[in-house]
Amino acid sequence: MTGQAEAIRRVHPTVSPKQAAQMLQEDGVIILKSFLAPDVMQRFQAEVDEDVEKTSTGARMKAYKLVNDKTKHMADLIVRSEVFRSDILTHPLYHAIADELFRADYGDHWLNASAVLQLMPGAPAQQLHRDEEIFAASKFRSPTDPQLSLSCLVALTEFTEENGATRLIPGSHLWDSAHPAPSPDQTVPAIMQPGEAILFLGSLFHGGGENRTENVRRGLGMSLIPCQFTPYSSHMHVPRTIIETMTPLAQKLVGWRTVESHRQYPFWQGGDRRLEDVLGLASREA
């Protein structure tokens, strides 16, 4: 993309999944109007408000370098919210679009992460990044290769340029490794009303904006990844009494402990904590 930054296309919720997926392949991002019904959003907010208020600002783990000290990142929504489990996680259009993007190349998809993201007054702009960068495989993708993730950010408050609306570079998912680094003047803000959502590919450059107001900016983020990013065999059915006779390395190899990527990014967590800590998992010494 060159010259003036392109606007983000806004689409009605009656859009067909195939049309939406085609727009994502072309632009890397779309805004979906009326993604969440007002009553769903209100019930979700009521369930998480108290926990969000109790959540401290800043990163819970050192790998979360994109979470600054004026941002709240509250994960573990499966545990915290029945509305998220029942009405949001299984959003039909979101999953139908993901099927269009992933199924032919990968098969099923699953939840990568979910969190409430709240920018406090004075929160600085986030560094521009691609969500797929947490996966080493992203280094080997060409712009025309299958995508590695599909992110969704729902506005729970109004998103304005002044309060830190997410900024994105439409078309940047088509940039190869030789392309110059992205710059803020290439971005456009995702201006949204509560209940609207941005969907964007993991290969698209984006970042949270600066909150220059006295109000918070709250969003609900979640991302889907292909099922290829999981072991062929599950070991969750193995009795815990057996697992706790194993060494920490053996437990990690069968999926009972958090693992780390090439950038020490934690995968397979329990909310914002290491899985073994949440479980209180015992082990035998090596």
Curated annotation (Swiss-Prot):
Keywords, in A-Z order: Dioxygenase, Iron, Metal-binding, Oxidoreductase
Pfam family, one: PhyH
Known cofactor(s): Fe cation
Pathway involvement of the protein, from the record: Secondary metabolite biosynthesis; terpenoid biosynthesis
Phenotype of null mutants: Impairs the synthesis of both terretonin and terretonin C.
Gene Ontology MF terms: dioxygenase activity; metal ion binding
GO biological process: terpenoid biosynthetic process
UniProt: Fe cation binding residues: H129, D131, H206
Enzyme class: oxidoreductase
InterPro entries assigned: Phytyl_CoA_dOase-like (IPR008775)
Enzyme Commission (EC) number: 1.14.11.-
Family statement drawn from the similarity comment of this UniProt entry: Belongs to the PhyH family.
Assembly information from the UniProt record: Homodimer.
Function text: Dioxygenase; part of the gene cluster that mediates the biosynthesis of terretonin, a fungal meroterpenoid that acts as a mycotoxin. The first step of the pathway is the synthesis of 3,5-dimethylorsellinic acid (DMOA) by the polyketide synthase trt4. DMOA is then prenylated into farnesyl-DMOA by the polyprenyl transferase trt2. Methylation by the methyltransferase trt5 then leads to farnesyl-DMOA methyl ester which is further subject to epoxidation by the FAD-dependent monooxygenase trt8 to yield epoxyfarnesyl-DMOA methyl ester.
Protein name listed in UniProt: Dioxygenase trt7
Organism whose genome encodes this protein: Aspergillus terreus (strain NIH 2624 / FGSC A1156)
Taxonomic lineage: Eukaryota, Fungi, Dikarya, Ascomycota, Pezizomycotina
